């Protein structure tokens, strides 16, 4: 199984036992995937030997930031006014688009939403709506405009790139030295829909060109090209990208000192808000006592919180980060109940209790499951009450169903494992799109947007079902690419890679290539759904949902497992604990 915050590569190879609490002590075997017997129970249980949290409660509560208070706010406001003046005075089309791109990548475009919205609307109708306008543009202007406008919901057809090849189907000679234009073409191609063959071909040509250019370029353009080839911009997590881009942009010749100062100050001020959100979630986590009572499960609260920063780093999503951290932590614990500790009989009972959502039914459960259900029940009811008190509508029916569906999907995978059933790839993916936890997390996100009525919520949920499906599929497949080996070593069910190999006789590299092609195809479907959304509330939700897919790429990147664990810890430190301007 897998879910938000699943880090199988964090499994420790312990040399001595480690017990936290007395209810269900962790018993470590000499091997990572060993079978252990819980002495408090007569059942044979698996152990994943998860390592303790790297960040203690006291450490988290001790964190603080100096980037708060009136002085910071006043300086930020002064800088914002200067940037607004820059936006108003910029008359060159290419430079205007570059400025919008810089503001986005620096992570400060949210401060100028109105100005950027007005700019792009004017640019679209004056320059990109009709072919006779954009036919005269060079490749760079076409590609940058295409990417930004599609990103913001404007329809620009793929035919804008028809003439980048000559009559022999080769790259036009005048483009051979246009590295920036080819880089923007490459990034633009990832906003394509299914069956947009021009963009597919453009991506292939641009990728080949950029790889060949790596030995011929240097400086900031080399950094941008290398970064893009590692992971395309459209698939990157905004907060992670802004941290990287601030450092790159600062070294660029001609970079704006005003933009640099504002980006750094805003990053640190927003980070201070994130610290308070994390401290709030940490207090909730300690109050559940799950870290001491359910010691077979992972204590991944900080990593869970990092996921929520991926959903949205913006200051106005503070309540959302606090709520989704709770959701992610509960998902992680439930995942370990089903994946590692529970017997099949217990899991069937527990799933029934979750489905009934009846506190009286817990008498039939073992003690550890009573603790788990009580914690889930109380936390979900608290979240429901907060929404009722602040927004005036009852979300419990939606939330209960989402959690019940998650547990049912977990049970299906547990039954497959215990009964030795090998599902088809399609059977696996249908269930895995739920068990990956995307639907339950995104159901909570629905109620954290600016929706103002039950009717609006219901419409948004119906309208975005495909979005949830596509995001969850990307989530699942990237998880499989990044963690299948670790989970298989732990004794988990077969994943998409192994199932494709089993069904087709493919080698592992061939299977991985196929899964990557499925991810790319699903992104194209997601792009199409993003483009046809009309309501503002749905668009807000879709932005959050798309960021979940981006976080999956970030968290489950391929590579050595120990290396990835170190990378995640490094990002936790740089994104959450270390101000750009210094402590």
Swiss-Prot record:
Primary site of residence: plastid
Motif range (DDXXD motif): 335-339
Binding, Mg(2+) 3: 479, 483, 487
UniProt: Mg(2+) 2 binding residues: 335, 339
Top-tier EC class: lyase
Binding site for Mg(2+) 1: 335, 339
An annotated GO BP: geranyl diphosphate metabolic process
Cofactor(s) of this protein: Mg(2+); Mn(2+); K(+)
Tissue: Expressed in every aerial organ except for the stem stele of mature plants. Not detected in roots.
Protein EC: 4.2.3.26
SUPFAM superfamilies referenced in this protein's UniProt entry, alphabetically: Terpenoid cyclases/Protein prenyltransferases, Terpenoid synthases
Record's note on what induces expression: By wounding.
Keyword set includes Magnesium: yes
Transit peptide: 1-40
Places the protein is found: Plastid, Chloroplast
UniProt-listed InterPro entries: Isoprenoid_synthase_dom_sf, Terpene_cyclase-like_1_C, Terpene_cyclase_plant_C1, Terpene_synth_N, Terpene_synth_N_sf, Terpene_synthase-like, Terpene_synthase_metal-bd, Terpenoid_cyclase/PrenylTrfase
Lyase is among the record's keywords: yes
Binding site for (2E)-geranyl diphosphate: 298, 335, 339, 476, 479
Pathway(s) where this gene product acts: Secondary metabolite biosynthesis; terpenoid biosynthesis
Gene Ontology terms, MF aspect: magnesium ion binding; R-linalool synthase activity; terpene synthase activity
Domain notes: The Asp-Asp-Xaa-Xaa-Asp/Glu (DDXXD/E) motif is important for the catalytic activity, presumably through binding to Mg(2+).
Recorded family membership: Belongs to the terpene synthase family. Tpsb subfamily.
Function recorded in the entry: Monoterpene synthase that catalyzes the formation of (3R)-linalool from geranyl diphosphate, but not from isopentenyl diphosphate, dimethylallyl diphosphate, chrysanthemyl diphosphate, farnesyl diphosphate, (+)-copalyl diphosphate or geranylgeranyl diphosphate.
Name of the protein in question: R-linalool synthase QH5, chloroplastic
Naturally occurring in which organism (per UniProt): Artemisia annua
Lineage per the UniProt record: Eukaryota, Viridiplantae, Streptophyta, Embryophyta, Tracheophyta
């Amino acid at each position: 199984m897998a879910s938000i915050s699943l880090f199988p590569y964090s499994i420790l190879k312990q040399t001595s036992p480690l017990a936290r609490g007395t209810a269900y002590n962790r018993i470590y075997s000499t091997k990572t995937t060993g079978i252990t017997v819980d002495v408090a129970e007569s059942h044979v249980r698996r152990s994943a030997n998860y390592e303790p949290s790297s960040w203690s409660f006291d450490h988290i509560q001790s964190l603080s930031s100096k980037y708060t208070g009136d002085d910071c706010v006043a300086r930020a406001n002064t800088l914002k006014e200067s940037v607004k003046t820059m936006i108003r005075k910029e008359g060159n089309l290419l430079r205007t688009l570059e400025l919008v791109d810089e503001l986005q990548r620096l992570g400060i475009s949210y401060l100028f939403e109105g100005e950027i919205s007005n700019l792009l609307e004017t640019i679209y109708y004056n320059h990109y709506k009709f072919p006779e306008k954009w036919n005269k543009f060079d490749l760079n202007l076409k590609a940058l405009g295409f990417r930004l406008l599609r990103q913001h919901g404007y329809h620009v057809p793929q035919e804008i790139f028809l003439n980048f090849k000559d009559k022999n189907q080769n790259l036009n000679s005048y483009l051979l030295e246009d590295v920036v234009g080819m880089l923007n073409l490459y990034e633009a191609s990832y906003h394509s829909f299914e069956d947009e063959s021009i963009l597919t071909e453009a991506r292939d040509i641009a990728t080949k060109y950029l790889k060949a250019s790596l030995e011929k370029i240097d400086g900031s353009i080399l950094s941008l090209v290398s970064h893009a080839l590692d992971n395309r911009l459209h698939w990157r997590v905004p907060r992670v990208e802004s941290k990287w881009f601030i450092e790159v942009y600062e070294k660029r010749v001609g970079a704006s000192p005003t933009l640099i100062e504002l980006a750094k100050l805003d990053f640190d001020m927003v980070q201070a808000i994130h610290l308070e959100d994390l401290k709030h979630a940490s207090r909730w986590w300690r109050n559940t006592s799950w870290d001491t009572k359910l010691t077979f499960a992972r204590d991944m609260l900080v990593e869970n919180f990092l996921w929520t920063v991926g959903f949205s780093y913006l200051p106005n999503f503070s309540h959302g980060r606090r709520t989704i951290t709770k959701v992610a932590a509960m998902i992680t614990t439930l995942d370990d109940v089903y994946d590692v500790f529970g017997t099949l009989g217990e899991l069937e009972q527990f799933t029934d209790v979750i489905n009934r959502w009846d506190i009286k039914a817990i008498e039939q459960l073992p003690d550890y499951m009573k603790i788990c259900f009580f914690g889930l029940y109380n936390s979900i009811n608290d979240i429901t009450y907060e929404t009722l008190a602040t927004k005036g509508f009852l979300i419990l029916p939606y939330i209960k169903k989402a959690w019940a569906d998650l547990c049912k999907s977990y049970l299906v995978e547990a039954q497959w494992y215990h009964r030795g059933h090998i599902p088809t790839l399609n059977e696996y993916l249908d269930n895995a799109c739920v068990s990956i936890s995307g639907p339950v997390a995104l159901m909570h996100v629905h109620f954290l947007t600016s929706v103002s009525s039950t009717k609006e919520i219901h419409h948004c949920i119906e309208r975005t079902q495909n979005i949830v499906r596509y995001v969850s599929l990307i989530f699942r497949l990237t998880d499989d690419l990044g963690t299948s080996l670790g989970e298989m070593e732990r004794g988990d069910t077969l994943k998409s890679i192994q199932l494709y190999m089993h069904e087709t006789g493919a080698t592992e590299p061939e299977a991985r290539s196929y899964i990557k092609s499925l991810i790319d195809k699903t992104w194209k479907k997601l792009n199409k759904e993003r483009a046809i959304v009309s309501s503002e509330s749905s668009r807000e939700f879709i932005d959050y949902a798309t960021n979940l897919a981006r976080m999956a790429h970030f968290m489950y990147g391929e590579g050595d497992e120990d290396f990835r664990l170190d990378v995640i810890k490094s990002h936790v430190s740089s994104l959450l604990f270390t101000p750009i301007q210094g402590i």
